[in-house]
Amino acid sequence: MTDTPVEESLFQIIHCFHQYAARQGDMETLSLQELQALLMDNMPRFMDSLGQKEPYYVTELFQATDKNRDNQICFDEFLYILGKLVKDYHLQYHRQLCARYCAQHSLY
């Protein structure tokens, strides 16, 4: 049986995490630099659309997520980041839908 698109996406997320984690030190954690590279390389339009392409956004996200303050993001912490990004993307999605709807149904 083949993987569903969602299953394939999950495997790709896991692979991506390990691919970037392997760049420096521990293969099971991301440094700030690895996280920045992962997000900028894999979500450039998304980060740009949120107006959060500046490094401080990723730095603040990293610091807020690194609960044990070891300057590394483990996979569980990375999942928290993904959840936040998905929420932000969902909000952006609705803003775009609303803008299109309002443009099509303008009273002016």
UniProtKB/Swiss-Prot annotation:
Pfam families referenced in this protein's UniProt entry, alphabetically: S_100
Recorded GO MF terms: calcium ion binding; calcium-dependent protein binding; chemoattractant activity; transition metal ion binding
UniProt keyword RNA-binding present: no
Stored CDD domains: S-100
Domain named EF-hand: residues: 53-88
Cellular component terms (Gene Ontology): cytoplasm
Keywords: Calcium, Metal-binding, Zinc
Cited InterPro entries: EF-hand-dom_pair (IPR011992), EF_Hand_1_Ca_BS (IPR018247), EF_hand_dom (IPR002048), S-100_dom (IPR034325), S100_Ca-bd_sub (IPR013787)
TM ranges: none
Gene3D superfamilies in UniProt: EF-hand
Ligand binding (Ca(2+)): 66, 68, 70, 72, 77
GO BP term (any one): endothelial cell migration
Disulphide-bridged cysteine pairs: none
Protein name: Protein S100-A15A
